[in-house]
C-alpha cells in the first residue's frame, strides 16, 4: 500500500518556492548531488528547476548510481523499471538489481532497450538458465554485431548454430549480421536468404544476396532460372530486374507473367520484343486461359492484328479458350472506326482503298466517314468498287437517307449528279425520274433544274405522261421546309405542261394551289 507521503509525492506537480533543501529531503523530493525533483506531465522531470529529463533517462541515471530512493520515486511517476536495471548494469549496482529481479521476471524483455554490447551481454547473463546460443540469437535479433564478433571463433566451429543465426538474421532483416557471417565464415547455402527476401518482398536483402553470391564467383544458371520463375510468378518487377543483371532468360519472366496475369511485368518487357515473340506469348495466354486484361494487353502490343490466325484458332479450339476471339471481334470494330477517321483525314484516296481491301472494310463505311470529313475524292474513288454506274447511283442514293449532316448530303448529291451526267443518255432515262424526286426531297434545286432539262429531251410520246406524273409526285413530296427555288421550278414546269396542253386549266390551278398552300 502507498503511504500518504507516497500519494502526495506521486501527484505533486508544483513545488512551492518556500520549500528548502531540508523540506525536500524530508519529502523525498531531493536527489543527492543533483538537486530538487519535480514531476512534469506523465513522462518528464525537472531537476533543480532548470534541467528537464525524461523520466526513463532519470531512472537509468539513478540506477547507475544505485540510488534506490530516487528509483522508487521515479517509478511512482510512471517510469519504466527496465531503465533502472539498465543503469544498474552500467554502474555494476547488482544490489539494486536483486531488489527488483522478482518484478522483472524475464530479463530478455530489457534487451531491446539496450544500445551498447557490453551492457547487453551483462543483462543477458542475469538469465541464469540461458547459454551462449541464446545470447547470440538475441544479439542477432537486436543487431548487436560486436557480441557476435566476440564469439566468432565459437561460431566458426558450430556450423549448425552459424546457419541458424544466418537464417534468423534473414527473418529479422539484419543486413550487417548477414554480411558479416557470410564474409567471415560463409554459410552452406544462400538459398534461404533469397527465399526469405522474396517472401518478405525485401529487395535490399535480395540484392545483398546476389552481391554475396557474386563474391563467391558462383552465379549458377539454374539458380537464376529458379529466381526468375519465383519472382515473376509473384509479379515482383524490381526483383526480376535485379536478377536479370546477373543473367537469365526473359522468356521465363514473360511466361510466368502470362500464366499469373501480371500485366505490369508484361507491359514492361513487351515493348522490347519483336512482333513474332509477342504472338508466341499470346498463344500461351490462350493456352493458360489468361484474363481479359492480359489478353487485351498482348493484343494492344500487336495493334489487334494477328498474322498467325490459323495457329491462334487451333489453340482456341484445343484449349477451349474463346475469350481472345470475342476480344478481337469487339476490338476490331472499335479499332477500324478509330483508324478510319485518321485514314480519311490524312491518307490519299488510293491509300484508303488499299487499307479498305486489306481489312475487308465495307465501302459504305468508308464513304460515310469520308462524307463526314468532306473528302469528295475518297467518296468518288471508293464508289468505283461498284463497277456498274447504275448500281453506284443506287447505292449512293440509299446512303443519302442515312446521313445526318446537311453538308454531307449536299456533297453526296453533287457526287451522284456527277455520276449521272457521265451516263449515256439511254442510261440516264432509267434513273432521271427517281433522282428528280430525291433532289426535290433534299432541296437540291440546282440538280433538280438540270435533270428537268434532260427530261425535255425525251420524245414527246414518252415525255408528256411521265413528266406530268413526275410533277404530281413532286407535289406530294414538297413540304413547308422546301426551298423557294424548288417551288419556282415546279411552278414553271406546271405552267409549261398547261401550255403544252398536257394539263387542263383545272389541273394546273389545283397543282398551283397545292404548291403554295
UniProtKB/Swiss-Prot annotation:
Pfam families: DUF249 (PF03158). Transmembrane segments: none annotated. Keywords: Late protein. Induction: Expressed in the late phase of the viral replicative cycle. It comes from the Viruses. Signal peptide: none annotated. Plays a role in virus cell tropism, and may be required for efficient virus replication in macrophages. Belongs to the asfivirus MGF 505 family. This is Protein MGF 505-2R. It comes from African swine fever virus (isolate Warthog/Namibia/Wart80/1980).
